[in-house]
Amino acid sequence: MLVPKRVKHRREFRGKMRGEAKGGKEVAFGEWGLQATESHWITNRQIEAARIAMTRYMKRGGKVWIKIFPHKSYTSKAIGVRMGKGKGAPEGWVSPVKRGKIMFEIAGVPEEVAREALRLASHKLPVKTKIVKREEMGGESNEG
């Protein structure tokens, strides 16, 4: 699973998720990409589940690029603990993904295989997505 090797601060502020992604809005490496159409935190487990779903469907053929990395820690308090007494312990790692960001890219497989692999990956993620091709940035929407 993806986790940072070393961080300066273990506990981070939550931050805001306003606006669109500043960069990473075009397909850069592969032929097909999975683009987020809404903003959300994506955990390292969700990224790994999507990666496994894609590679299994492609039968280890082609190449997959993961364009997001979970660099932000999130905390939670134990169940039954009252309010106050400081911030909770680090629980896991997330990648804040804004609207328009390309999360995964695929190359080296036929169009039908790429579309189905990205569709399967989109069901593992908590955001609405669309499948985009390298040339035209229109795309097929997956509201679900």
From Swiss-Prot:
PROSITE patterns xrefs: RIBOSOMAL_L16_1, RIBOSOMAL_L16_2
InterPro entries: Ribosomal_uL16, Ribosomal_uL16_bact-type, Ribosomal_uL16_CS, Ribosomal_uL16_dom, Ribosomal_uL16_sf
Domain of life where this protein originates: Bacteria
GO-annotated biological processes: translation
Entry GO MF terms: rRNA binding; structural constituent of ribosome; tRNA binding
Keywords in alphabetical order: Ribonucleoprotein, Ribosomal protein, RNA-binding, rRNA-binding, tRNA-binding
Pfam families assigned to the protein according to its UniProt record, in alphabetical order: Ribosomal_L16 (PF00252)
One GO CC annotation: cytosolic large ribosomal subunit
Alphabetical list of CDD domains matching this protein: Ribosomal_L16_L10e
Oligomer status and interactors: Part of the 50S ribosomal subunit.
Function text: Binds 23S rRNA and is also seen to make contacts with the A and possibly P site tRNAs.
Membership in a protein family: Belongs to the universal ribosomal protein uL16 family.
Name of the protein: Large ribosomal subunit protein uL16
Organism (species): Enterococcus faecalis (strain ATCC 700802 / V583)
Gene (name only): rplP
